[in-house]
Regions:
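Short, basic, glycine/proline-bearing loop/turn elements
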Residues: 49-51, 78-87, 309-314, 348-351
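Intrinsically disordered, low-complexity segments enriched in small/flexible residues
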Residues: 1-69, 73, 217-305, 309-312, ...
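A structural preference for short, pocket-lining loop segments at secondary-structure junctions
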Residues: 67, 71-80, 95-120, 297-311, ...
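Conserved catalytic cores of soluble enzyme domains
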Residues: 116-232, 344-450
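Charged, alpha-helix-enriched surfaces in structured cytosolic catalytic cores
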Residues: 10, 91, 129, 159, ...
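A structural preference for long, well-packed, hydrophobic secondary-structure segments
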Residues: 142-143, 310-337, 355, 366-373, ...
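Conserved mixed alpha/beta catalytic, RNA-binding, or beta-rich assembly cores of soluble enzyme
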Residues: 81, 89-92, 96, 130
């Protein structure tokens, strides 16, 4: 994928790219009559607005309306960068507030198509405080259980990024777009420009995907139906994959089978379970764990299920935070959650500690414990201590025959107890880590499969 900007689109051009044909209808929103040269009586402000209106054909820096995207109806907020750099002023705030209010009244998701340099200088602090208005509308929309899926274009900087962009539930970005809180004219002279791009924000966990303009309609058409289909019914646990070898005979047999490279991993389970799925990426705190935690939403038997799945590696702090983000989003939207447990344990290297491993695991424990939406868990491999338990649903966890769950790895337990290596296998039996042991102990509900 190219990392060069794909060209700037006007507000109506970007609407035409994402909306189903002939479905966009502009909202009949009223805005305040401006004072001469604005609230600060800024010399030449009226003339600047008049030139912007003549050049773009718009009366303000946003165009708001409804449309269908992939058949799903949504409120669209399209920024016109040609109108004073897509900046936010008082009248912009009026339009944004009215659009969000309409979305809540009609139970519609909001899709901001953002391209802005930030707050409008000619309106001073009154422009800056529009960010508080926008944040309030976003918060009310969250409380209403409605999704917000942002598309950040070139450029998206300042308060527009810090509210409508980064504050959305899901963030898509155009390739090569300038994206960041600091715009090009205010960042340090020696700053690396590559850090202020869509691709850099993806790597930093602030963007979920980089999508080419011609693919936006399809991408949004996958996201919106999934995020607007609540269900109070728990997700059923997946059927087991792989051979039917029966339950393990010993604790060490359970460990050996769970660690086998031939055992199906999370990606195989997700592919078998979902008709189609879309992934979220990143913890919104500067990190990602794409090799350790898979998170997103998919369709299972005609309804949406959210998923957070460990891949069999040591889970990084960013992975736990991404899973917590996923569960809280699903909870707000009323979507059931499926988690797949498979890790030898949380990453325990020095870098993981610096990244806040303990706090990240604690956050996931709380997200699962506090979820009102039903959470179903399946242990598909290694259940390594608290790093695995954090993802498991209390009272609704199941296990495959190729799995185990333990307070600690048998080798480490033997070492702590100062037992010789030959005692590792008996220690595994003593720990009672087999799936059938876990059922008998009341740790899990049952096993899946024959």
């Amino acid at each position: 994928m190219s990392d060069q900007p794909t060209g700037r689109h006007s507000a109506r051009e970007i609407v035409a790219l994402v909306a189903d044909d002939s479905t966009f209808a502009e909202l009949p929103l009223s805005i305040r009559n401006p004072r001469p040269d604005g609230p600060l009586a800024w010399p030449g402000y009226d003339a600047s607005r008049a030139r912007a209106a003549e050049r773009t054909g718009e009366q303000e820096s946003v165009v708001c309306g409804t449309a269908r995207i992939g058949g799903a109806r949504a409120v669209l907020i399209a920024f016109e960068f040609g109108f004073l750099g897509g900046s936010l002023g008082q009248r912009t705030g009026d339009l944004l507030e009215a659009a969000y209010t309409y979305a809540r009244e009609h139970r519609l998701p909001v899709v901001p198509l953002v391209a802005t340099g930030g707050s409008r200088m000619q309106e001073g602090m009154l422009a800056l405080t529009q960010l508080q208005r926008v944040a309030r509308q976003s918060a009310l929309t969250r409380e209403a259980g409605l999704a917000q899926v942002a598309v950040v274009r070139d450029p998206t900087t300042g308060g527009g990024w810090a509210t409508l962009g980064a504050g959305a539930d899901v963030v898509l970005a155009l390739p090569g777009a300038q994206v960041g809180f600091a715009g090009s004219r205010v960042r340090p002279a020696d700053a690396d420009p590559a850090a202020y791009t869509a691709e850099a924000q993806l790597a930093a966990g602030a963007v979920d995907a980089v999508v080419r303009p011609e693919e936006l309609r399809e991408a949004l058409g996958r996201w919106l139906p999934l995020l607007t289909s609540p269900s109070g019914t728990p997700a059923p646990p997946p059927e087991p994959l792989g051979g039917s070898g029966g339950l393990p005979g010993t604790g060490w047999d359970a460990v050996r089978r769970a660690r086998s490279p031939r055992r199906p991993r999370a990606a195989a389970y997700l592919d078998a379970y979902f008709t189609h799925r879309v992934a979220i990426s990143g913890d919104r705190c500067g990190g990602t764990d794409p090799d350790g935690m898979l998170c997103g939403f998919g369709e299972h038997r005609g309804r949406t299920v959210a998923y957070a799945a460990q891949t069999g590696t040591a889970t990084r702090p960013a992975g736990y935070r991404t899973a917590a983000r996923l569960i809280r989003l699903a909870d707000r939207l009323g979507i059931p959650v499926l988690t797949l447990v498979d890790t030898p344990g949380a990453a325990n290297d020095a870098e993981a500690e610096r990244e806040g491993a303990g706090a990240a695991i604690a956050d996931l424990f709380v997200a699962v414990a506090g979820a009102r939406t039903p959470v179903t868990s399946l242990v598909i491999g290694e259940g390594g201590s608290g790093g695995a338990l954090a993802l498991a649903a209390p009272g609704n966890t199941w296990a495959t025959a190729d799995s185990y769950f333990s307070v600690i790895a048998p080798e480490l337990a033997a070492a702590i107890l100062k037992r010789p290596p030959r005692e590792v296998e008996p220690t595994a039996d003593q720990l009672r880590i087999r799936p059938q042991d876990l059922v008998e102990l009341g740790v899990i509900r049952g096993t899946v499969g024959p």
